Regions:
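Phosphate-group recognition and catalysis centered on beta-loop-alpha active-site segments
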Residues: 1-281
């Protein structure tokens, strides 16, 4: 498998995050995967957004301040984003990538500490799986989350669907509600326990913050046939350092910058899908 260039939130460094415009720009830059965040509307549509609600940072309209789970898609479509884009759906992004061979990394935004602010983890996982299966794109999609209940549920619903266990020092620690009931014993799981826990959750890869990546973590992950995909990396020297450590891919807001780093190291690069926005990368 080639080194992964994951365009974070549709490469938010070169376009408005989590919009069809940013996804098109990332495709034009040449990436292996688009990464995006999703939640669930009241009528069961998987929508693309990093937030739990319509916020003034992202949009204006009558429904600002309301949770996605309390709004239907028609109401969400009335929100103005100021970019010419409306909020998009997972299915629309799947349609965008379907002809091009690019993968999709779908982050389920749920929070076990705020269960009343999003749809239940199991329901969101079910809707994601249903949407991906309906497009016949299971082999090109990955589901990931900091809330590992999504990982467990996704694997149960669709065993062939790949998953990534996202992790930070605050979500993987003793007493954590984020690890799907798996007990964390170490106060520094990035030095030994993280890989075993993610493996038990059924993950195919781990997604640590790049500050948590270390040689032991990578050795243990590779010994378990798991990939290491750190986020979110935008500085060239950090990209070089992580590649030297042996990571399997990088999540970045600047895919063009990562391509430059990989090119000088003679990595095989994915072909751009189009060149309309390539200069912006």
């Amino acid at each position: 498998m080639n080194f992964e260039i994951q365009a974070h939130r549709g490469a938010r460094g070169i376009g408005p995050r989590n919009t069809l415009e940013s996804f098109r720009r990332a495709l034009a830059a040449g990436v292996t995967n688009l990464e995006l965040d999703v939640g669930l509307s009241r009528d069961g549509v998987v929508i693309v957004s990093h937030e739990r609600a319509a916020t003034r940072l992202e949009c204006t309209g009558a429904h600002v301040g309301k949770l996605w789970k309390d709004l239907e898609l028609d109401q969400i479509r009335t929100l103005e984003r100021g970019t010419g884009d409306r909020f998009t759906t997972l299915d629309e992004v799947l349609q965008l990538v379907q002809p091009h061979g690019v993968g999709l990394v779908i982050e389920a935004k749920v929070d076990p500490l705020r269960p009343n602010e999003t749809a239940p983890a199991a329901e969101l996982a079910q809707r994601i799986v249903d949407t991906v299966e309906a497009r016949g794109l299971v082999s090109r999609c990955v589901v990931q989350s900091f809330d590992w209940r999504v990982i467990v549920e996704s694997r149960w619903l669709c065993p062939e669907l790949r998953t990534t266990a996202l992790a930070t020092q605050s979500t993987v620690r003793p007493g954590s509600a984020w690890t799907a009931g798996l007990p964390v014993r170490s106060r520094n799981p990035f030095n030994g326990e993280l890989v075993a826990l993610a493996f038990l959750a059924g993950a195919h890869a781990i997604g640590p913050h790049h500050h948590g990546v270390n040689p032991k973590l990578i050795r243990e992950a590779h010994a378990a046939a798991m990939r290491v995909l750190p986020w979110t990396v935008n500085r060239r020297w950090t990209m070089h350092a992580l590649i030297d450590l042996g990571v399997d891919g990088i999540v970045t807001d600047r895919p063009g910058r990562l391509r430059d780093v990989l090119a000088v190291r003679d990595f095989e690069l994915p072909l751009p899908v189009a060149d309309e926005f390539a200069r912006a990368a």
